[in-house]
Each structure stands twice: as structure tokens, then as C-alpha cells.
Amino acid sequence: KHVYVLDATNKYTPANLIPYDVLYTEGLVIEKLSSSDWGWKTLWNEEKLFQNTTIVIADINENGFMTGEASIGYAEYSRLERMPVLKKGKQKFIETYFNPKNSGITVDSLSVENEDADSLPLNQHVKFTEKTSSSGDYHYFSVNLFSGLEKNPFIADNRFSDVFFGRNQKYVLHGKFSIPAG
């Protein structure tokens, strides 16, 4: 059984997704008037996710300089969150989603697929460079590049409410990093 909530004020929400601002609230759902099968119900579809898939392939040289490519797929609510920013331009998208979360990374190019097909994942291909951090003879880097998981949401010393992310989430990360011998 599917629940459809149509919101004409948000042009990026497809009909198969409950708009995010009413997700997990209550609404008057009318199923069958003849059988009195209607009433106030929680607007929730556990099958629809905030879904990110990130594939990173990168090489790191002896000086700790990383060059690589990433393919990123944003589906369902993840796509929905990013579309308004993408419509403002690729540079604004890079400034919003890549630069603040991945400090030190330079995005050399960004290409986007399925921008106008709301039933398909928003796919991006990114070429990037980064100077890895170092301490003495060791170079280190985060494998969570472009995933949305760069910063830990649980590091606050004092929390004043329960953690509720607003929708079910699924993150898939694949990484292949080549490092110099030795």
C-alpha cells in the first residue's frame, strides 16, 4: 500500500516520495470513503531512503599528494536535498557539498547525469586532488571522501535531544587507494 502526498510548492519532490517537511508527521489519509477506511495516520514509508553511494579511486604519491576520481550516486531523499543547490549551478554545488566537508580537496571537474530524471539517482563524476595530512614520515587521509560522513555527528559533549535523522539512511562506500611502496 502506497501513501502519496503531493506538494505543489516543492518542484523537486517526485510523487513517489513523501515531502521531507511532512515526513513522520500525521496526515488525514482517505483510502476508501465507502468503507470508512480513513483517518489520521503517520506519513512514513520505510522503503524510501536517504541513499548515497560513493566510489573513490585515488593514487597517492611519495609526497602525500592524492589525485583521483569519485563516482557519487544520490538517490531518493539524498537526491531531493541536493537538487535545489545543483540548479543554482555546479560551482555553488561544489561550494556547498564538497568544499566545507572535504577541506583541502580541490575539485578539478564535476559532471552530472540524470539531473532531469527525478526517478533515477543523481549521478556525479568528480576529478579531484588533495594534499594529505602528515605527521613526521606518515601521511594520512579520510576514506570517507564525498560521502556525507566526513564529520562525526556524535562528537558533541552535551546533547539535549534524541538523535533522529528524519528518514532512513543508507550509505555505501567503496574505495581503492594506491599508495607508494615502502
Listing of model-derived features with the role each one plays in the protein:
Residues 1-182:
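A sensor for short, sequence-defined functional sites
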